[in-house]
């Protein structure tokens, strides 16, 4: 092999190795920043279509309804624990160490983002409550089997009268 060909081959191999390394690092970074959405039932039994279950230590988003009577507050700190459930009956525990949103209450739809600290236990870093009594995050509405219903106004409401 002449020196010119050897130099080209070395350059081509170095270029392929460099592009492969960059692609690997990019995919690793994207995977570590990926937050998959799950319902409580999917956390317990896996997703219906793929059977994928979140692993302990994985960052995820969970949506469901706060179970009535499940909220436990620590009087000495901001720590709070509550359960969320979905229409399929799955229920998980969410722990949170910060102030809950003003609109948070039992029986309401929420989305919690955090790390799965144990099977069925989410250590939340963020809790989002719905905006009003008619709003539900799209992921939660889909998981709960609900669809958006358009509000019907009567003529008096449309004309501005109460």
Swiss-Prot record:
It is a single-pass type II membrane protein. The chain crosses the membrane at residues 9-29. GO terms for molecular function: heme binding; metal ion binding. It is found in: Cell inner membrane. Keywords: Cell inner membrane, Cell membrane, Cytochrome c-type biogenesis, Heme, Iron, Membrane, Metal-binding, Signal-anchor, Transmembrane, Transmembrane helix. Coiled coil: none annotated. InterPro entries: CcmE (IPR004329), CcmE-like_sf (IPR036127), NA-bd_OB-fold (IPR012340). GO terms for biological process: cytochrome complex assembly. The keyword Metal-binding applies. The keyword Transmembrane applies. It comes from the Bacteria. Heme binds at residues 131, 135. Residues 1-8 are cytoplasmic. Residues 30-162 are periplasmic. GO terms for cellular component: plasma membrane. Belongs to the CcmE/CycJ family. Heme chaperone required for the biogenesis of c-type cytochromes. Transiently binds heme delivered by CcmC and transfers the heme to apo-cytochromes in a process facilitated by CcmF and CcmH. This is Cytochrome c-type biogenesis protein CcmE.
């Amino acid at each position: 092999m002449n020196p010119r060909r050897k130099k080209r081959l070395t350059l081509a191999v170095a270029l392929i190795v460099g592009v492969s390394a960059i692609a690997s690092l990019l995919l690793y970074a994207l995977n570590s920043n990926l937050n998959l959405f799950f319902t409580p039932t999917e956390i317990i039994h896996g997703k219906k279509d793929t059977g994928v279950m979140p692993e302990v230590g994985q960052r995820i988003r969970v949506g469901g309804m706060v179970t009535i009577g499940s909220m436990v507050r620590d009087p000495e700190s901001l720590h709070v624990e509550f359960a969320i459930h979905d229409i399929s009956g799955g229920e998980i525990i969410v722990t949170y160490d910060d102030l809950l949103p003003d609109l948070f209450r039992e029986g309401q739809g929420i989305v919690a983002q955090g790390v799965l600290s144990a099977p069925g236990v989410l250590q939340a870093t963020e809790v989002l409550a719905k905006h009003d009594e008619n709003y539900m995050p799209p992921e939660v509405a889909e998981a709960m089997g609900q669809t958006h219903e358009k509000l019907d106004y009567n003529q008096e409401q449309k004309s501005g009268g109460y």
